[in-house]
């Protein structure tokens, strides 16, 4: 009896144990990452030929304690390598694990190689050569703490390489994991199986091979036992012949069918090639088709199983499309696949909840470094009385109501950018802004008392409902997360896409960037204030402080300002402002752009202006500013400097976003100024629900 070890992906050990026992293995013992078992020579070859789950089958040769590199060398050399392979064979060493002595796996592999070579040369035998790419023998050494385990890898290449996949193609899951996923679906061979996002077809091919009794090792050309001295070619040929006979019989007797589709024509072509090479091409129909086009291939029965490994995203900007995809799949399953089973394997359990289906079973597994889950569902048959479930129904109804109200109003006003929803319902705590045919959903960060998983699921529901109600393509929705009322944070960079969208606001054309920054380049709540500045600016010298992207300057310029001066500390935003001015034909010496700390510039400037717009941050302690700034504490010092720049008869429009801001009217009077609050006049319909979003004042000489 041979003592053997079969390695596998984390989470599949029990499944592998059952498989090995069915092959005839005895004394199976599950450990993390694999199964120890025993079997005769025939079982060695059967496990290599028939295991769909094992990553490798290894023959343990011994263990040694490693307190120094010499210990490793001597421990390896103690094995009788001349009984393992012949001098003319090539070999390679795979070394994994480190300890205080062996701190580099390449160094460990070198010491093992030296020990093996010396074992031959000391017997005056020719030294075996190393071949890292295609060796006859693979030696596996795993170092854990002070113990090195040495084994012969009888697989050669990993057993996931069945011999049918184009090696140039990238597979999101290995074939061994794909086989496990198929086994866990509850799918019964002989019933239909469909994968609507099949990629290169791995899941369907593994299922078809399982259903037709085709051994996973049947198409492999190389094995790790080819140079093994104890290899029994006769028994191997018997095992191989039996596998070929069973495969022919299984294919001839199988009558059901498999269906695969994907939106990418290139991967579908690869899937067809892979299926043909696997010997089951005639059983699978592959189509180029998007999930939105998915239909039941057997509407009159029999019932089958839908199985897939749908895409998932690690970046926030990919989530809206994925949420829409999962939500759509859930609706299609309910509408067209009643009575079928559904099994999805994913690294994002939150996305699976977008299906709006209740899972009957779930399994955990590792896909490389990723923690994944497989969930199985049974789709109930629809009845004449059943109505499709609405996702976030209260939110969807409110958004639909707001859309009807604001869409017509915005068209009449001549604006393309407006707020559709602003946390109208406390449990749906987001803002939804429209920018032409794009939509930005901003999630206000939930309180720490709210369960993070529930908050994320609520957000996914919001996105699915938003896409559905507004009828937009998922790639036209941008998702952001922000803290409520923590200042504008306008300088926070989120991305590097550099994609700008031209929008209109009354008679102005402006550039917005929906993806690269927390804000988009256009504060929608100041829309009416900008229009007022345009109406007030004819023939006047206009100053815009803390200008951001200069949208207020554009309105002033279009309103007929004699000159405009735009000041901001950020070069990025000044360049953006320049683009906005140029877009509206506002160029030349009359339109100055100044990069400076606005407070310092204000203290030193000695020019005069008829109209000044200033929208300072609530609080700032930027390293590039000389002093920390607090708008409540420091607004009088600001007014003192502004008065010095204000021409007789001039006006200051002063705005800020501090909730509960109190204007120091007595302080203004001492400066010879008076203030008229115009906050309510500057709130348009889409911001009427949030009366504290900003404060706005007109300040003139008393």
Swiss-Prot record:
Indicate where this protein is primarily found: cytoplasm
Its annotated compartments are: Cytoplasm
- Entry's Pfam families? Methyltrans_SAM (PF10672), RlmL_1st (PF22020), THUMP (PF02926), UPF0020 (PF01170)
EC numbers: 2.1.1.173, 2.1.1.264
THUMP domain sequence ranges: 43-154
Q: Does the keyword Transferase apply?
A: yes
Catalysed reaction equations from the record: guanosine(2445) in 23S rRNA + S-adenosyl-L-methionine = N(2)-methylguanosine(2445) in 23S rRNA + S-adenosyl-L-homocysteine + H(+); guanosine(2069) in 23S rRNA + S-adenosyl-L-methionine = N(2)-methylguanosine(2069) in 23S rRNA + S-adenosyl-L-homocysteine + H(+)
Cellular component terms per the entry's GO annotation: cytoplasm
Q: What keywords does the record list, in alphabetical order?
A: Cytoplasm, Methyltransferase, RNA-binding, rRNA processing, S-adenosyl-L-methionine, Transferase
* Origin superkingdom: Bacteria
Q: Give GO terms: molecular function aspect only.
A: 23S rRNA (guanine(2445)-N(2))-methyltransferase activity; RNA binding; rRNA (guanine-N7-)-methyltransferase activity
User: What functional role does this protein have?
Assistant: Specifically methylates the guanine in position 2445 (m2G2445) and the guanine in position 2069 (m7G2069) of 23S rRNA.
The family note in this entry says:
Belongs to the methyltransferase superfamily. RlmKL family.
User: What protein am I looking at?
Assistant: Ribosomal RNA large subunit methyltransferase K/L
